[in-house]
Regions:
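Alpha/beta-hydrolase superfamily serine-hydrolase fold, recognizing
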Residues: 16, 72-362
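Short, low-complexity intrinsically disordered segments enriched in small and basic residues
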Residues: 1-24, 30-38, 43-69, 74
Length: 362
């Protein structure tokens, strides 16, 4: 008889969200098999795959702890206790490497982390966060951040972590074009399937990803159609963490001392050897360029550590001042003693600030 049922929870489990049922054999079979034998505790799942080796110790533990009865009545095991548990967070699905655009032999992909319910209510949808990883505009690492992004999915937000073309492949504004193509792909292919409300789309990014999130929203607010053949979906808000917003300041300060001598992110993003000689390109890739009274700038949340050694905190301080001067809805959170990115931006306090910002503007 079934002893317990487990669905892949917030950690994704060994099989993600495929329902998994642990069963103990009847008492005779359980007695005949050794305590550590996986054969005495078979597993069935929706896909009917065999249990991964990583699960064997768990199965043995379940058999030892769950199948310990207070009394026996034939083959029926009577449990010692019954407990009621409640979940404060949603389960989620992780769908890796979804291709949204192809440029010759180059594919751009996204990672999807989607809230999961066994049964959705009619018309129930979730907001979308399009997340852009930081990478100094070079090739992004797309997998290490999944556990952190899953915390947002647990709070009820669909997350699409979007890989955009690195500067070595294409200079700015190719990265902004990729964001539009990713949003369009989600709207056309995925939104209905995963209960995503495209009218509640937010952009989020850290470091260079935050820069691309800002530029995508601000260029759209200024009436610039970066991908003319695609319909622009409304952007309800932007969350930018440790983001460079003033490329003139980047060019002036040069490469951080802890970076290799061959590291020239600003020059590579603009596709030039000396950024200072191309002020028009620096302006095109700077957020402040697109701020003007009357522009329909979406709400913006800026977060920055005051001890950032890679992206000067002046970027966010100055941008916040310019946003408020132009009548934009902007919030700025400065994290005391925090360097560039990392774990401080994924604490429960910061996640709650982000969640409150999204709920406020949904």
């Amino acid at each position: 008889m079934p002893l317990a049922e487990s669905r892949g929870g917030a950690s994704g489990g060994v099989w993600g969200n495929a329902p998994t049922v642990f069963r103990a054999l009847n008492s005779k079979k359980a007695t005949n098999k050794g305590a550590g034998s996986e054969a005495s505790l078979p597993v069935t799942s929706r896909s009917r795959r065999s249990a991964p080796k990583l699960l064997y110790p768990l199965l043995a533990y379940c058999r030892a702890e769950w199948a310990r009865p207070d009394s026996r009545k034939g083959d029926i095991l009577i449990m010692r206790q019954t407990r009621t548990v409640s979940l404060d967070t949603l389960e989620y699905l992780y769908i890796p490497d979804v291709t949204y655009a192809t440029y010759g032999e180059t594919q751009r992909k996204m990672q999807l982390i989607i809230p999961y319910r066994p049964q959705w209510q009619d018309g129930e949808t979730v907001p979308l966060i399009v997340f852009l990883p930081g990478s100094a505009w070079y090739r992004q690492e797309m997998y290490n951040g999944i556990p952190a992004l899953a915390k947002l999915a647990e709070r009820g937000f669909a997350v699409a972590s979007v890989q955009y073309r690195e500067s070595k492949i294409a200079p700015f504004p190719a990265q902004v074009e990729d964001v539009h193509r990713a949003i369009h792909h989600i709207a056309e292919q995925l939104a209905k399937l995963f209960h995503i409300d495209m009218a509640r789309t937010f952009l989020m990014g850290n470091s260079s990803g935050g820069h691309i999130a800002l530029l995508t929203a601000l260029r759209q607010a200024a009436g610039i159609a970066d991908v003319s053949e695609l319909l622009n979906f409304p952007i309800r808000g932007v969350i930018a963490e440790s983001a460079p917003s003033d490329l003139f300041l980047c060019a002036k300060e040069g490469v951080p001392a802890n970076m290799p001598a061959t590291f020239h992110p600003t020059a590579d993003l603009l596709g030039v050897s000396c950024p200072q000689e191309h002020p028009e390109k620096l302006a095109e890739a700077s957020a402040q360029t697109y701020l003007a009274p009357g522009h329909a700038v979406p709400p913006i949340l800026l977060l920055h550590g005051d001890s950032d050694a890679q992206v000067n905190v002046a970027h966010s301080r100055t941008l916040y001042e310019r946003l408020t001067q132009n009548g934009a809805d902007a919030d700025y959170i400065e994290l005391a003693g925090v360097n560039h990115g990392g774990a401080p931006f994924w604490t429960e306090d910061v996640l709650q600030i982000i969640a409150d910002f999204i709920h406020k503007h949904c």
